[in-house]
From Swiss-Prot:
GO annotation, biological process: proton motive force-driven plasma membrane ATP synthesis
Signal peptide span: none
Protein name from the UniProt record: A-type ATP synthase subunit B
Cited function: Component of the A-type ATP synthase that produces ATP from ADP in the presence of a proton gradient across the membrane. The B chain is a regulatory subunit.
Molecular function terms from GO: ATP binding; proton-transporting ATP synthase activity, rotational mechanism; proton-transporting ATPase activity, rotational mechanism
Compartments, record wording: Cell membrane
Assembly with partners or alone: Has multiple subunits with at least A(3), B(3), C, D, E, F, H, I and proteolipid K(x).
NCBIfam families linked: PRK04196.1 (NF003235)
Gene for this chain: atpB
Family of this protein: Belongs to the ATPase alpha/beta chains family.
CDD domains in alphabetical order: ATP-synt_V_A-type_beta_C, ATP-synt_V_A-type_beta_N, V_A-ATPase_B
GO cellular component assignments: plasma membrane
Keyword Transport: yes
Any coiled-coil regions, as ranges: none
Length: 462
């Protein structure tokens, strides 16, 4: 991407980390696009982070490696960074800055859109509703994803979140309607092998035809990670609000995004906040997460599933902590379940979807969905208590009902949580398994479900 025109300056005062400080600047604007010309004639893009006292601090997307103060020029082009968009972006693969990575020509643009997006008027926001089927029972059954929601996945280093992300991207759909559905997948700071896995997974399954894939690799400049989720969401907003599609945006790994933000903050010598992250981390994350939603009078929707790895599996770390304040629930992957070979290792007791009630029930999934979900959650919680008790007194000290709850816990992990990476379960199959699980209990223990549903769906003998 090159840009023409603008005002050129050759007085580069300093190069510090990913930043270039330009002297003698007049009439520059915050977030303005800047083209850096190197000694060898190469060009790199950047944007203005700060202006004042005749100086401009420019963040260079491709990094400053190889740049020198002498011979480097900066051209301020008078506009912000924009992403060219059209229906032709579907089925395409781009790098973290939105440039084609699949050896195909640039898609013909219908329009160019500011990557920072337009703020959604709160009065024009429509409440998220309607079910998105991921084909993953743990999510569909107990922490349902709703159109327009932002539901993060909290994972840990080395766990199976990338496999789960790819499975959701392949399988997700809106059921019972003829509405168009698309997936925008942004991989942020991932290894080459992970990027190839995402690409092959979408291509071989045929899901790439309805998807847009952005790949920012670990060896790309960290600064590029700040741009990747924004170009991805710009495409998603165009598909949703201009073309009327329901769009699922998967962002992985947002921890790499936050690390890049910390790197830039340190280079600017800003006063650090918790664990060295900038004090505006919450505000910055909200500019990404709040781009999910639905608008009154618009057919489409943007739903987000951001994925982040919790450093040291610490859910109180600033990144998951602040993410939880902005988003509407969380899906937490458990290390213990992962070690036991459960996939996906969803810890349902630490997970929830705050908007689940608005996307399920009669006319959306099934009339008993909420109650059987509550019953499974309650039974699993009781099973965990019984397991802890058995660790102290042994199985011989347990009552018959305790043993049945322990069996329900095992069944839930082995049948409801565990599924193959290519297994796409319908909501009917998921609800059937949930009834199979609690049918290991006597009817009088099913206190979260109405009697009429017990009579209709219960599969036990008593």
């Amino acid at each position: 991407m090159t840009v023409e025109g603008g005002v050129q300056y050759s007085r580069i005062a300093e190069i510090k980390g990913p930043l270039v400080i330009v002297d003698g600047v007049e009439n520059a604007a915050f977030d303005e696009l800047v083209e850096i010309e190197t000694n060898e004639g190469g060009r790199r893009l950047g944007k203005v982070l700060e202006i004042g006292n005749g100086k401009a601090i420019v963040q260079v997307f491709e990094g400053t490696t190889g740049l020198s103060v002498a011979g480097t020029n900066a051209r301020f082009v008078g506009k912000v960074m924009e992403m060219p968009v059209s229906r032709e972006v579907l089925g395409r693969i781009f790098d973290g800055l939105g440039r084609p990575k699949d050896k195909l020509p640039d898609p013909i643009a219908d329009k160019f859109i500011d990557i920072n997006g337009e703020a959604m008027n709160p009065e024009q926001r429509e409440y998220p509703k309607d079910f998105i089927q991921t084909g993953v029972s743990a999510i569909d059954g107990i922490m349902t994803l709703v159109r327009g929601q932002k539901l993060p996945i909290f994972s840990g280093s080395g766990m199976s979140h990338n496999i789960l992300a790819a499975q959701i991207a392949r399988q997700a759909s809106v059921v019972g309607t003829g509405d168009d559905f698309a997936v925008v997948f942004a991989a942020i700071g991932v290894q080459y092998s992970e990027a190839e896995y995402f690409r092959r997974s979408l291509e071989e399954s045929g899901a790439l035809k309805r998807s847009v894939l952005f790949l920012n690799l670990a060896n790309d400049p960290a600064i590029e990670r700040i741009i990747t989720p924004r170009v991805a969401l710009t495409v998603a907003e165009y598909l949703a609000f201009d073309l009327g599609m329901h769009v699922l945006v998967i962002l992985t790994d947002m921890t790499n995004y936050a690390e890049a933000l910390r790197e830039i903050s340190a280079a600017r010598e800003e006063v650090p906040g918790r664990k060295g992250y900038p004090g505006y981390l919450y505000t910055d994350l909200s500019t990404i997460y709040e781009r999910a939603g639905r608008l009154v009078g618009r057919k489409g929707s943007v739903t987000q599933v951001p994925i982040l790895t919790m450093p040291s599996d610490d859910i109180t770390h600033p990144i998951p902590d602040l993410t939880g304040y902005i988003t509407e629930g969380q899906v937490v992957l458990g290390r213990d379940l992962f070690r036991q070979g459960v996939y996906p290792p969803v810890n349902i007791l630490m997970s929830l979807s705050r908007l689940m009630k608005d996307g399920i029930g009669e006319g959306r999934t099934r009339e008993d969905h909420q109650e059987i979900s509550n019953q499974n959650y309650d039974a699993y919680s009781r099973a965990q208590e019984v397991r802890a008790l058995a660790g102290i007194v042994g199985k011989a000290g347990l009552t018959d009902i305790d043993l049945r709850y322990m069996g329900v816990g095992d069944s839930l992990e082995q049948r409801l949580l565990t599924q193959a990476t290519d297994e796409n379960r319908t909501i009917e199959e998921t609800l059937g398994i949930m009834w199979d699980t609690v049918s290991g209990l006597p009817k009088n223990e099913l206190t979260k479900v109405k009697d009429k549903y017990v009579e209709k769906f219960y599969k036990g003998s008593a």
